[in-house]
């Protein structure tokens, strides 16, 4: 079943084109809530940090986000999200997690930000 929306926000044609062009082993996060709504973040390294710290790979600048909040880690071509001891927790599909392997369409909540996870298999050409 192709995914056509991110819950709060329908996917644009540009979003769908970007998802279709993803290389195997990479993924895309699309922000659906927060000051960066509509922003896209490419996951293309083995480890990607998320937090309020300016040195984070993905900077989410809000007091609800810890300086070092979470890490996206790739193992055998699949990404997991790992909470980095954050104060407010990391959630996948509204469940608080310490670590969780991600699937297409999963919604990751970090502070007040919501990010939806996609790989190239989310879209059927």
How would you describe each model-predicted region?
Residues 1-60, 122-125:
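Intrinsically disordered, low-complexity acidic Ser/Thr-rich regulatory segments
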Residues 37-114, 119:
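Forkhead-associated
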């Amino acid at each position: 079943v192709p995914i056509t929306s991110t819950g709060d926000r329908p996917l644009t044609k540009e979003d769908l084109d970007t998802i279709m062009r993803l290389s195997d082993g990479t993924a895309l996060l699309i922000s659906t809530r927060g000051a960066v709504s509509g922003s896209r973040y490419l996951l293309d390294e083995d480890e990607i940090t998320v937090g309020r710290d300016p040195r984070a790979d993905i900077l989410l600048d809000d007091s609800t986000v810890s300086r070092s909040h979470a890490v996206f880690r790739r193992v055998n071509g699949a990404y997991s999200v790992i909470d980095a001891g954050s104060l407010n927790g990391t959630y996948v599909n509204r469940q608080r997690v310490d670590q969780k392997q991600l699937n297409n369409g999963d919604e990751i909540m970090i502070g007040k930000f919501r990010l939806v996870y996609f790989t190239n298999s989310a879209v059927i050409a």
